């Protein structure tokens, strides 16, 4: 939904880098909990397969630092099982041609740093300005980032706005 940029400019404004033309692809898979919730446990395997069929670029996969495995116990309850992940250094956005993610919030950092996003069409906030067909990895969309950030800003509120009804009012406008 189109929103004015006032909230973005007041609360979230930051420098937005020009679009970059890096060489590699950054893949940010959903956490195990998200993959389980959305029933996309095969997302990473399918995504890598699609990317390899459509590009010869280097693909870096970066898991979230804390990503416990979700399992079902003997009575059928969902439980988490801690599993170590490799925490890589800070992302060097200059290296990347695109970020591919299911619905990671890191897409905001990617877009802010000038790296276009490929994402899930239904479950990612970046979908309105990003390519959702991963087979088009060589032709990213370069959408209006400020419009997206402005829309996202209208879904974040201060404690005062939650207490005084502003948040509720904005939610009911949508």
Labelled PLM ranges:
Residues 1-22, 36-38, 128-174:
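Leloir-type glycosyltransferase catalytic cores
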Residues 13-14, 45, 85-88:
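A generic local structural motif
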Residues 20-71:
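Conserved catalytic-core segment of nucleotide-activated headgroup transferases in glycan assembly
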Residues 24-25, 57-59, 117, 146-152:
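Hydrophobic anchor at the start of a short beta-strand
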Residues 50-53, 110, 124-127:
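Glycine-rich loops and low-complexity Gly/Arg-rich segments
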Residues 60-113:
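Donor nucleotide-activated moiety binding/catalytic core segment of transferases
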Residues 78-88, 118, 131-138:
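Short acidic-hydrophobic, aromatic-tinged amphipathic segments that line or gate anion-handling sites
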Residues 103-107, 117-130:
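Short glycine/proline-centered loop/turn elements that form peptide/ligand docking sites
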